[in-house]
Regions:
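Membrane-embedded transmembrane alpha-helical bundles that form the catalytic cores
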Residues: 1-288
C-alpha cells in the first residue's frame, strides 16, 4: 500500500508540497525496506526448508542512532563484502599506505590519517552507489550522500560533544536516543528521494517542494541554518571567554570587519529584508 502513495507523490510531485512530500518520501522508504527485507525473509525461509541457515541481512536498520550504525544494520552482506574485499584492501595498497607521508607537513598526523581514510571511504561509497545503478541518482542517494553524512559527522563530533555538555544532554537518555533515531531516518529518507527520483534535478525539485510548502524557500532555510549555527557557536564560545574580549585581542581591521559584517547581516535580513514586518515582533504582545 505504501507503493501507491509513494508513486502518486513522486510521479506528480508538482501537485504536492510540504508535509505531503515528506509523507511520500517516508512511504517510499518503508516500501523499499519492506520489499527488500521481505524478499530476504523468503530466501531465508526457503533455505531453512533445506536445512540451510543463512545469516540475517537486516537488523532493524531504522532503530539506528547514526548513519554508520544504519549501514551496519542495512544490507549487512553487501557492507561486509565491500569492507573485506574493497575498503581494507584499498587501504593496504601502496598509494594509500604512502599517502599519510605525502600529507605530512600539510596536515597533522591525525589529520593525514583521517584524510587517507576519508578518500578510501569516498571510493567505497561511490562503489556502493554505482552498485545500485549507474545513474547519478543512485550514486548520490545510496553512496556519496552517505559518505558526506559520515565524514561530516566525524569532523563535527568534537563540536557535538561540546554541545551535549553545554546543554547537559546525556547520550543514553530515551529522549536523546529518540532524537538520534528520527534524525537518522530523516537523513536516510533524503538519500532515498534521490534514489526514487528519475534524475538529480527531479530529486532537488522534490526536496524543494518539501521545503517550500513549509513556508520557507532554500535561501531562507540556509539563512536560518547559518543563524542557528552561528548563535550556537557564540553561546558555546561565551562559556569560555566573552566574545567581546576575544575580538579585543584581534587586530583593529578584523574587529571592524566582524562588526560591519554583523551590522549588515542584521540590516539586510531584518529591517530591509524580505518579509519583514514590525507588527510581527513577538514581545510587543507581552506586558512587562
Amino acid at each position: 500500500r505504501t507503493a501507491i502513495l509513494a508513486n502518486e507523490i513522486f510521479n506528480n510531485y508538482e501537485k504536492y508540497s510540504g508535509v505531503s512530500i515528506w509523507v511520500g518520501a517516508a512511504a517510499f522508504t518503508m516500501q523499499l525496506y519492506t520489499d527488500f527485507d521481505g524478499c530476504m525473509d523468503i530466501v531465508l525461509g526457503i533455505s531453512e526448508c533445506f536445512g540451510i541457515r543463512l545469516p540475517e541481512n537486516f537488523s532493524a536498520p531504522f532503530l539506528s542512532r547514526s548513519i554508520e550504525e544504519y549501514w551496519r544494520r542495512w544490507h549487512i552482506s553487501l557492507g561486509d563484502w565491500l569492507k573485506n574485499y574493497l575498503f581494507y584492501p584499498l587501504l593496504r595498497t601502496k598509494f594509500f599506505m604512502n599517502l599519510p607521508k605525502k600529507l605530512k607537513g600539510k596536515l597533522s598526523k591525525k589529520g593525514a590519517k583521517q584524510a587517507t581514510t576519508f578518500l578510501a571511504m569516498l571510493i567505497l561509497w561511490f562503489t556502493i552507489g554505482y552498485w545500485h545503478g549507474g545513474a547519478w541518482t543512485f550514486i548520490i542517494g545510496s553512496g556519496l550522500l552517505h559518505w558526506f553524512y559520515i565524514v561530516s559527522g566525524k569532523l563535527m563530533e568534537p563540536l557535538f560533544v561540546k554541545w551535549r555538555a553545554f546543554f547537559h544532554i546525556e547520550k543514553e537518555k530515551k529522549g536523546f536516543i529518540l532524537f538520534q533515531r528520527v534524525r537518522t531516518f530523516f537523513l536516510v529518507m533524503i538519500g532515498l528521494v534521490f534514489f526514487r527520483s528519475a534524475t538529480v534535478p527531479d530529486a532537488l525539485r522534490v526536496l524543494g517542494r518539501g521545503v517550500s510548502g513549509l513556508g520557507l524557500d532554500w535561501t531562507e532555510l540556509m539563512i536560518l541554518a547559518v543563524s542557528i549555527l552561528f548563535s550556537a557557536w557564540v553561546t558555546i564560545h561565551n562559556q569560555k571567554e566573552d566574545m567581546r574580549v576575544t575580538l579585543e585581542k584581534k587586530s583593529i581591521w578584523l574587529r571592524w570587519i566582524a562588526l560591519y559584517a554583523l551590522l549588515f547581516y542584521v540590516i539586510l535580513l531584518g529591517k530591509y529584508g524580505p518579509g519583514y514586518s514590525a507588527s510581527e515582533f513577538i514581545y510587543q504582545n507581552f506586558k512587562v
